[in-house]
């Protein structure tokens, strides 16, 4: 029987510790992990809970992140509630097994403290690893601060383990900016948190010897297509479950979450779209510009990167007077438009208004995104809206040292 962990009504936790506390409250059976900056404190925290008797689960220390996710796959297939944590190069090493986990429909929870991918080597936060996982078949949920890192980790178990979903879930938080920043967090009592998540009810667990099953079977052109189509459908169908889980969490805590968060969009003529901790910076900048210059600025932030909430983004754009929309990607685009820009463009294309769309690459390797820079971008969007066309390159690098870097101009007759 696990010992009780004393919690105050308000704790001062960073995002990593908040996530580790959520893992403890979920009473996980197995964590298989290989530590890497900046997510190390998550698994360190879990290891200390096990060592000190605060949880009855197993902490398996392995030789690599590939082995960590492999261990998670085995434990989940055996019928356990399983989680781990990683970042950056560790995430990259896991990628092969991420596809195994989702293809086998195993509801593992992976807490990711986002960090830049080498080379050059960098331990600071951007969204390179988050974007790397976008086609892996996992649900991806984003936290903007430490409170949300705690809340979203709890929700991740309830979403992934739902029998209508049965898919693994990533909970993303910005490395250092969220993972290491201490903030007020309002935790649930252990029994309340566990009741919210519920007992794990595995499906087709391998340790049920009365009902032998096969996991990870080989399929070729005869059935592979159908398997992947069903997996995609399950991911898309999870949208309803995510909404239901968020609604239940609101009823329990009063904290409301949506698959897409929007701020001041009702009358916004220009808007920024971005992810993670930068959302709070952008909201502050928008409020200041509204007060100082009367500029009608709004913010859109998808909380669920997968399944991507195209319908909700479309409705937010359609229901606002927005004329210019800027998508900010915190990852090197590698010779193309940013991933967030591409997703938002798909949603915006289905609207009748079709606002002007631009793409900013920002914050790579942890480069600071300041309020003044957010205001500069907003003013540039206002210039586009006033002119009725994009007055700069469609894609620009924000906060870059040296000459301005931009690509792809619109053609005007």
Q: What are these regions, as identified by a protein language model?
A:
Residues 47-52, 284-299, 349-350:
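Short helix-loop-beta junction
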Residues 265-295, 308-315:
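Redox- and metal-dependent alpha/beta enzyme cores, enriched for Fe-S-associated oxidoreductases
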Residues 168-261:
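Conformationally flexible catalytic loops at phosphate/diphosphate-handling active centers
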Residues 12-19, 247-270:
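Glycine-/acidic-rich phosphate or pyrophosphate-binding loops and their flanking alpha/beta elements
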Residues 124-168, 172-175, 353-367:
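Conserved thiamine diphosphate
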Residues 329-413:
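Peripheral docking tails and interdomain loops at the edges
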Residues 1-132, 137-138, 154, 402-405, ...:
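Thiamine diphosphate
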Residues 42-45, 71-74, 94-98, 119-125, ...:
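Short acidic, glycine/serine/threonine-rich loops at helix termini
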């Amino acid at each position: 029987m696990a010992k009780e962990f004393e919690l105050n009504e308000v704790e001062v936790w960073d995002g990593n510790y908040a996530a580790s506390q959520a893992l403890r409250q979920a009473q996980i059976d197995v964590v298989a992990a290989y530590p890497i900056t900046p997510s190390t404190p998550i698994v360190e925290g879990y290891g200390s809970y096990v060592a000190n008797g605060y949880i009855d689960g197993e902490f398996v220390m392995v030789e690599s992140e590939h082995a960590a996710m492999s261990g998670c796959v085995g434990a989940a297939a055996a019928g356990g509630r399983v989680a781990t944590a990683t970042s950056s190069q560790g995430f990259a090493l896991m990628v092969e097994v991420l596809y195994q986990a989702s293809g086998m429909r195993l509801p593992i929870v992976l807490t990711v403290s986002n960090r830049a991918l080498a080379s050059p080597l960098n331990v600071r936060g951007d969204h390179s690893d988050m974007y790397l996982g976008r086609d892996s078949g996992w649900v991806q949920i984003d936290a903007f601060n430490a409170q949300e890192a705690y809340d979203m980790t709890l929700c991740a178990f309830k979403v992934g383990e739902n029998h209508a979903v049965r898919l693994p879930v990533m909970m993303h938080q910005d490395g250092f900016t969220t993972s290491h920043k201490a903030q007020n967090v309002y935790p649930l009592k252990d029994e309340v948190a566990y009741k919210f998540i519920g007992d794990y009810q595995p499906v087709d667990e391998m340790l049920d010897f009365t009902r032998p099953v096969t996991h990870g079977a080989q399929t070729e052109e005869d059935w592979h297509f159908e398997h992947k189509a069903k997996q995609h459908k399950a991911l898309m169908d999870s949208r309803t479950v995510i909404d239901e889980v968020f609604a239940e969490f609101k009823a329990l805590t009063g904290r409301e979450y949506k698959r897409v968060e929007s701020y001041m969009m009702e009358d916004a003529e220009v808007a920024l779209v971005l992810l993670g901790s930068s959302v709070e910076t952008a909201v502050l900048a928008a409020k200041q510009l509204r007060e100082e210059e009367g500029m009608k600025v709004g913010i859109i932030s998808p909380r669920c990167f997968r399944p991507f909430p195209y319908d909700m983004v479309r409705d937010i754009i359609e229901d606002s007077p927005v004329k210019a929309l800027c998508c900010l990607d915190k990852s090197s685009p590698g010779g193309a438009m940013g991933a967030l820009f591409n997703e938002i463009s798909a949603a915006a294309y289905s609207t009748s208004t079709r606002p002007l769309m631009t793409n900013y690459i920002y914050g790579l390797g942890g480069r600071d995104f300041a309020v003044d820079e957010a205001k500069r971008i907003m003013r540039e969007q206002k210039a586009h809206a006033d002119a009725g066309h994009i007055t700069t390159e469609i894609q620009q690098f924000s906060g870059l040292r040296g000459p301005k870097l931009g690509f792809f101009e619109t053609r005007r007759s």
